[in-house]
Amino acid sequence: MIVLTKENILSYIKEHVPSLELKEPIKVSMIGDGDLGEDVEGDGYCNYVFRVSDTEGHSYIVKQSTEHLKRRGRALTPTRNRFEYEIMELRAKIVPQYVPALYLGDPENNVFIMEDVSNLKLIRFQMNKNHLFPELAKQGAQYLAATHFYTSEFYLPTEEYRKLLTHFMNAELRVVMEDGIFLQIFGSDHYDAACGPEFEEYCKSIRFDPNLEFQRYKLRHLFMSKSETLIHGDFHTSNIFADDTHLKVIDMEYTFGAPFSYDLGFIIANIISQACSAAFRPFDMETHRKNYVAYLISLIEMLYTYYIQFFFEYWEKDAKLEYKITNGYKESLAL
């Protein structure tokens, strides 16, 4: 397997995708190393991600996975790159407007090449600057509702659905979420001490509350055992590029079968975090703070409302007849 670097990536592109439009001078940058600024530094934490561009507006993202994660000590199978390419292909057939275009899938070298969407901005950093995204709730909800419904058994033939779940079992990466989200919470890492001893003790008092432990293990079991659809798995504000009218979703390597509600809950948790940050960081006027926090809170409600709206639209159009004619089934999904 070739390991891509800034020095050899152009020869790799010329050999594998000679039709890709690039004209000298060509610039190669590595995402995640601070080469491009925070507005486009969305990926590159676990993988090697390059931006290759020229001065005439052609720009591409080249992503390679290796066994050893870029910024973590643990090892994961590099075939996650192939799974990500395959799920992007599938989701591009469902919601092409929200998925970057794909130009190459190379499973031998665990590489794929896709559209550079950095003409948009990562919403995490823009929210830190108090930016509003008027279409985020509607577009984000449509992306989730469509990709969830059309990879569920409500739509797919049962055999095809089971094959899809088996193919995207993703045994190694799902453990990252099963443990990282439900077990390794605040107070379990030495970095938490940076917040100060009083805050650390306060958080530990919550973490070790018996009822909380009971509830999170219940949720973990539900997450592990209820495979309703192929989730994104890592749908948060650093994996969504947007502007006032467009949205693109990246970093889909964590896809596997799980409950419908997980992705929606994950992005809502991120927005709650943004609202907490906005409640305490400096604003030029207190009314601006209140307005921005109110916007973030309303975003949570709108995401859920639009998700249900779109999901029900797809249900009415394409759900299997046996589900459609079962009185109350559709409505029960929103409870």
Which stretches of residues belong to each language-model region?
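Conserved NTP-binding catalytic cores of kinases and kinase-like/nucleotidyltransferase enzymes
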Residues: 1-110, 244-247
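Active-site activation/catalytic loop segments of kinase-like enzymes and analogous catalytic loops
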Residues: 86, 262-316, 335
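Short helix/strand-bridging catalytic loops that position acidic/His residues to coordinate divalent metals
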Residues: 71-73, 123-133, 249-256, 284-291
